[in-house]
Amino acid sequence: METFTWRYLGHPVHCVQQGASEVDEESPALLLVHGFGASTDHWRHNIPVLGRTHEVHALDLLGFGRSAKPRGLSYGGSLWRDQLVAYVRERIGRPTVIAGNSLGGFAALAAGAALQSDCAGVVLLNAAGPFSDEQQPPKGWGAIARQTIGSALLKSPVLQRLLFENLRRPATIRRTLNQVYVDKTNVDEALVESIRLPSLDPGAFGVFRTVFDIPRGQPLDELFADLTAPLLLLWGIRDPWINAPGRRSSFQRHAPQATTEVVLDAGHCPHDEVPDQVNAALQDWLATLPQPST
């Protein structure tokens, strides 16, 4: 596996790649996108397997993992969408399947819609993001914290710092992961450290503070309407964070007609919890895609 630094908006972005010299160049490349607070390390059980048949890339979104966490950036879906679009066009240079988990799923869908013919497919694993017809505000760390503590108090930098310090404690990270993994076998020290270590970077607290004000982003139904590539929905159906059965119903109402679905007995991060099942489902679906024209 090759690791390297790519630059976006002048900032260093951590990337990994596997399989480029060993696979058929006629098959689409694959770009993997992590969720909030995670990194390329979260694809530890997927890259080695998928790299046997495809050119596989993964990157850390700006603000996360080993990538830069600069002040002054407007963190949110638009930034991460544009980062993925630039990476596909500048680094990969051919049609690419983009797969994302949680927040990374929203960014993957937005990038896939923007890339048009440069996108060979989109894979969403328990993706985040709103629909136009949703009346309730989006859920996530910000919503949970507001309900628990109160919106007014969260404007306090002191309270934000205390919350941040608690959330990055190893015991808190492990407890949170145990809540969203049904099978806890892979909730190990390596996973906990992959989340904790980036939180020690000087800019990490600044990125964390933005989570309370990240804009909702373009509705998923609008992105589905703009998407011209095949779509695969991979569900960890026992995800307690997003009410996966209800969320799945919303996706079924709005997703393109030819969408493929795979439902797994897993939580919020099926790619790491049940990687063998996710890898098999991905490889089966990838084999059905038309060969891209280069």
Where would I find each of the regions flagged by the language model?
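Active-site loop/oxyanion-hole signature of alpha/beta-hydrolase fold enzymes
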Residues: W6-H11, V16-E22, H57-A99, L103, ...
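Conserved HGGG/HGGXW glycine-rich cap/lid loop of the alpha/beta-hydrolase fold
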Residues: Q17-R66
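Short N-terminal helix/helix-N-cap motif within the alpha/beta-hydrolase-1
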Residues: A38-P48, R66-K69, A107, D133, ...
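Short glycine-enriched nucleophile-adjacent loop
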Residues: G105-Q116, V122
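Conserved loop-alpha-helix segment in the C-terminal half of the alpha/beta-hydrolase fold
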Residues: D226-A266
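Catalytic active-site module of serine/aspartate enzymes centered on a nucleophile-bearing elbow/loop
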Residues: P256-T294
